[in-house]
Amino acid sequence: MKLTIASLIVAIAAFAAYAQAPTLQIVTSDPNLPSDLFYGNVKVKPLRVRPGTNPPQFITIDDSDFFTQQQYVDFLSRMPDASGFGFWLNQITSCGGNAACVAVSRVNTSGAFFLSIEFQQTGYLVERMYKASYGDSNQTSTLGGSHPIAVPVIRFSEFVPDVKQIGQNVIVNQGNWQQQLEANKVSFSQAFVQRSRFTTAYPTSTAPAAFVDQLFTKVGVTPSATDRNTAIGEFSGAADISDVAARGRALRDVAENATVAQQETNRAFVLMQYFGYMRRDPNGGQDTDYTGYDFWLTKLNQFNGNFINAEMVKAFIESSEYRSRF
């Protein structure tokens, strides 16, 4: 709250200097998700009051129900469904007043969202599609001395709208979710391969075999003959990749390859700590490079992907940067 109050004082002083009245704005980028509150051009935190309480009881990120809801918003880009919400909330509230149990359950609950079928088939798939299409981004880390580091190429500003598109109307284990998810994947992949960035990287005159080989090279995987032939076969013997639907299917064949998914897991898991909890890129905000990302990826690898033993999720949800969002 101190940072917010300080920001408001600065903003008020600035507006006063120019004799302009500040305005309070509610900004909604997605009508299905919580809105942002701005005082002038300064983003501020709203006071959340629990309905029916008198005197008012304020809701914070320490409240189990609000914390659980936020995992849906940050990782699945949707509000929680009743059954799922009840299940995850119970994982925390079943601890009663045992603070140590609550702390562990919050970590386990939050980490489970990355590992969930819904996220693996939406957000994580989007990350792998960017990887298959554009490879890595070369950045810098100072961990153990300054050195280059290859990191996921997708940026937060790209990730957010793409996840909303591919996950639209999907709630695992509800209704015809599998058919809806597949329809979303088809629609998203076809739109993705028609973007100018993609068609510039892969002209439609490219031969299917060359196209598929480039995609597998980007992900750093040598495919089996079967996997390679399956992806090439999407073009049904055509001489080029002008068929949009076939391009989309071939890209998915590579991005959904089991080896690719396994190899990219830890890198994506660390990336999602920044995208999900901090709502920014790893080299944004208080970070000017990928040193923090490098630190957590190194630690997660040391613990063979065990985020609990690596204390990665714990560190992010207990960080002042995360908590100050609320």
Residue positions per predicted region:
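Composition-driven recognition of low-complexity segments enriched
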Residues: Y18-F326
